[in-house]
Amino acid sequence: MIKYYDRKTQTYQIEKVAGEKMIRWTYSSPVGMRLLETVVKKRMCSSFYGWYLDRPISRRKIHPFVCKFDLDLSIAEKNLKEFSSFNDFFYRKLKPSARSIDPCQDSLISLGDGKLLAYEDIDLDCLVQVKGLTYSLKELIKDPETASKYKRGTCLILRLCPTDYHRFHFIDSGICEPSHRIKGSYYSVNPVALQKVAKLFCENKREWSIFHSDHFGDILTIEVGATFVGSIIQSYTPHQPVARGDEKGYFKFGGSTVLLFFEENKIKIDPDIVEQTKLGYETYVLFGEKVGVRHKRR
């Protein structure tokens, strides 16, 4: 059971997890862990399933998925019959009216829909995965020089579960450098898996880039793939100016995670999100929603 904080109702909710029984069995039983290490975490397994979900025959999975998780397709650009495959449905675009971007330029907005954790004044060699498990930023991006820029900065972790909108966006205007790809495994990013696999983000396939934002400094963006995530698609053009809210990319099928690292004294996260993180709970947010503000120098 995964509890998260709904800041709109100020209550705790239970997440509906796609494939929950299978995830718990895989990461909690000896047989499941053996299968995980020999088959599930391998690229071939995710690539094959991704290939299937790109085929028209996978369309038959869409309607049961929508019904089971009570998804609102009225906010999607396409209707149910227009999706060419399950993946086409999975990384669906939303109507412009579906999400509103906080109008204040000093507001730090969420890059997408998902469950958010926030850590301030971070120790680069002791980043929190879950209580008791840590990793380092230089291990994560394999670039010690770049990692050192974010000493005592802020880290945001947005977890996208399979039922979420799976496109991610720029949180400010600016210019983004090309993405660096790092090969890796395909562990789940579900909290159950995060409690079982040490340095999971450093083990999984991932991509990172530096976004030179106009209002929040140089932001390190890291997209992490997961089980059955066939691809991390970057839809932006490197070195070209982007506007606040422009799409950066999207994930194909699977749960996924995006991490943002900010330099010291660039942002201040909303107190409720920081408090819930300290209590061990993620906060549910939507793309464009205010999650913090620009740090005002005195």
UniProtKB/Swiss-Prot annotation:
Example GO BP? phosphatidylethanolamine biosynthetic process
Q: Which residues form the signal peptide?
A: none
E.C. designation(s): 4.1.1.65
Subcellular location, record wording: Cell membrane
What cofactor does this protein call for? pyruvate
Please indicate which residues carry the site annotation Cleavage (non-hydrolytic). Answer: 255-256
* Active site per the UniProt annotation: 113 (charge relay system), 169 (charge relay system), 256 (charge relay system), 256 (schiff-base intermediate with substrate)
Task: Tell me which residues bear Pyruvic acid (Ser).
Answer: 256
Q: Which parts pass through the membrane?
A: none
PTM summary from the entry reads:
Is synthesized initially as an inactive proenzyme. Formation of the active enzyme involves a self-maturation process in which the active site pyruvoyl group is generated from an internal serine residue via an autocatalytic post-translational modification. Two non-identical subunits are generated from the proenzyme in this reaction, and the pyruvate is formed at the N-terminus of the alpha chain, which is derived from the carboxyl end of the proenzyme.
How the cofactor is bound: the record states:
Binds 1 pyruvoyl group covalently per subunit.
User: What GO molecular-function term can you cite, just one?
Assistant: phosphatidylserine decarboxylase activity
* Disulphide connectivity of cysteines: none
Keyword terms of this UniProt record? Cell membrane, Decarboxylase, Lipid biosynthesis, Lipid metabolism, Lyase, Membrane, Phospholipid biosynthesis, Phospholipid metabolism, Pyruvate, Zymogen
Pathway membership of this protein? Phospholipid metabolism; phosphatidylethanolamine biosynthesis; phosphatidylethanolamine from CDP-diacylglycerol: step 2/2
Q: What InterPro entries would the database entry show?
A: PS_Dcarbxylase, PSD-B, PSD_type2_pro
GO CC annotations on file = plasma membrane
Q: What is its main location?
A: membrane
Pfam families, A to Z: PS_Dcarbxylase (PF02666)
Query: Which family does the entry's similarity section mention?
Result: Belongs to the phosphatidylserine decarboxylase family. PSD-B subfamily. Prokaryotic type II sub-subfamily.
Annotated protein name in UniProt:
Phosphatidylserine decarboxylase proenzyme
Question: What organism is this sequence from?
Answer: Desulfitobacterium hafniense (strain Y51)
